[in-house]
From Swiss-Prot:
Residues 191-268 are annotated as: Lipid-binding and lipoprotein association. Residues 80-233 are annotated as: 6 X 22 AA approximate tandem repeats. Keywords: Chylomicron, Endosome, Extracellular matrix, HDL, Heparin-binding, Lipid transport, Lipid-binding, Oxidation, Phosphoprotein, Repeat, Secreted, Signal, Transport, VLDL. Gene3D superfamilies: Apolipoprotein. Residues 256-268 are annotated as: Specificity for association with VLDL. Residues 244-295 are annotated as: Homooligomerization. This is Apolipoprotein E. The modification Methionine sulfoxide is found at M143. GO terms for cellular component: chylomicron; extracellular exosome; extracellular matrix; extracellular space; extracellular vesicle; high-density lipoprotein particle; intermediate-density lipoprotein particle; low-density lipoprotein particle. The modification Phosphoserine is found at S147. Its main location: secreted. Residues 1-18 form the signal peptide. Sequence repeats lie at residues 80-101, 102-123, 124-145, 146-167, 193-211, 212-233.
Amino acid sequence: MKVLWAALLVTFLAGCQAKVEQPVEPETEPELRQQAEGQSGQPWELALGRFWDYLRWVQTLSEQVQEELLSPQVTQELTTLMDETMKELKAYKSELEEQLSPVAEETRARLSKELQAAQARLGADMEDVRSRLVQYRSEVQAMLGQSTEELRARLASHLRKLRKRLLRDADDLQKRLARLGPLVEQGRVRAATVGSLASQPLQERAQAKLRARMEEMGSRTRDRLDEVKEQVAEVRAKLEEQAQQISLQAEAFQARLKSWFEPLVEDMQRQWAGLVEKVQAAVGASTAPVPSDNH
């Protein structure tokens, strides 16, 4: 990836520092293309490389530069490459944010904000390049038929400055993305841990859950039995106490009844005995022999 960036930087410097009419050395292009193909960077980096390659091609135009810049083809091509670069960058940013999902929300939001700002700066730089070319095309149209050497020099100067800004902002964005590496790895480890837990056999997890549930129910049942035993013992003690009180009350009532009825019974016994004696006396008198008149 770093080799690709270096190759593109060398290419861009060569295009900016050389005169516009100067042809490109034939040995440089195959070497740079081979280095670019040998390094498989992120899609957004490759798209940015294509943007730089096209800009370099525009700068190395010779006699045809006025004709090409007078048509909207260059700006249209640059707009397409800009859109492609930003699209790839947004996709890569979204992929990183998905991998950062296990990270703390505050950290993820801060990193996302930083990446978005760097992405906006890079997009603004590319838009500035396109605007400069549009402005140059307008000035060339106004000076049609006149010498455009001064305009070309101004354009080359502007593009050199813009190249530095592009390089700085792209390098800043790349560094910020590189700082996400440890966090992405941390998110992958957490995701792998969760995945290993989720890959346990369903039966094993169900049995573990059932055992935990049975242990909980057994503990609750034992607690309930102990509570019932305490309640039964308490009720038994109360019943025994009440039975003892009833027994004492019955004995006291029996004693009171006895004290009430004993005098009556004794009086009735005496009266009965006297009545029996009277009856016996009457019966004895009636059975005595009557004296005869013949004597």
